[in-house]
Structure formats: structure tokens, C-alpha cells
């Protein structure tokens, strides 16, 4: 029973952290100056060809980086 409670608490904590990081990502998309230089090093900019979202600076890929 204690193990179940601990596991439920851990899952809830992870869910809250995921929501918090998603909000931060959306906030940084609105203001690109908030992104760290390390995060954008080597990423592709708007209009460049991409195969996966992780290649783009803001992680939006539809054959080309959207942002």
C-alpha cells in the first residue's frame, strides 16, 4: 500500500513538472531572446529544410522549419 502511494505521488510530481516545462517552452517561443545560446547552437532557422522537429531551433518542422 505504501509503495502504491509513493508511486502515485511520483507520477503526479512528474506530470506537474512536464506541464511546467511545457509552459516554459511556450513562453520561450513567444520571446526567442529567452532561449539560451547553448540550446540553439547548431539548430536550423526558419525556412531551412528539416527532417525532424529536433533539428529546428524552436522544434516546429513541416519539411522546413516553421519558426
Swiss-Prot record:
Q: Does the keyword Disulfide bond apply?
A: yes
Q: Which GO terms describe its molecular function?
A: ion channel inhibitor activity; toxin activity
Q: In which tissues is it expressed?
A: Expressed by the venom duct.
- Please provide the record's keywords in A-Z order: Disulfide bond, Knottin, Neurotoxin, Secreted, Signal, Toxin
Report the superkingdom from the record: Eukaryota
State the compartments where it is located: Secreted
**Does the keyword section mention Zinc?**
no
From the UniProt record, list the residues forming the propeptide.
25-37
Which region is the signal sequence?
1-24
First-listed, main subcellular location of the protein, grouped into a coarse class: secreted
Q: Name one GO cellular component term.
A: extracellular region
Record-annotated disulphide pairs? 43-57, 50-61, 56-65
Q: What is known of its domains?
A: The presence of a 'disulfide through disulfide knot' structurally defines this protein as a knottin. The cysteine framework is VI/VII (C-C-CC-C-C).
Similarity comment: Belongs to the conotoxin O1 superfamily.
What protein name is recorded for this chain? Conotoxin Cl6.10
**What species was this sequence derived from?**
Californiconus californicus
List the lineage, top down: Eukaryota, Metazoa, Spiralia, Lophotrochozoa, Mollusca
Amino acid at each position: 500500500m505504501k509503495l502504491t502511494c509513493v508511486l502515485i505521488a511520483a507520477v503526479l510530481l512528474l506530470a506537474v513538472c512536464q506541464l511546467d516545462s511545457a509552459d516554459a517552452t511556450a513562453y520561450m517561443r513567444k520571446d526567442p531572446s529567452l532561449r539560451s545560446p547553448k540550446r540553439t547552437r547548431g539548430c536550423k532557422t526558419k525556412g531551412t529544410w528539416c527532417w525532424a522537429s529536433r533539428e529546428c531551433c524552436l522544434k516546429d518542422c513541416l519539411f522546413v522549419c516553421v519558426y
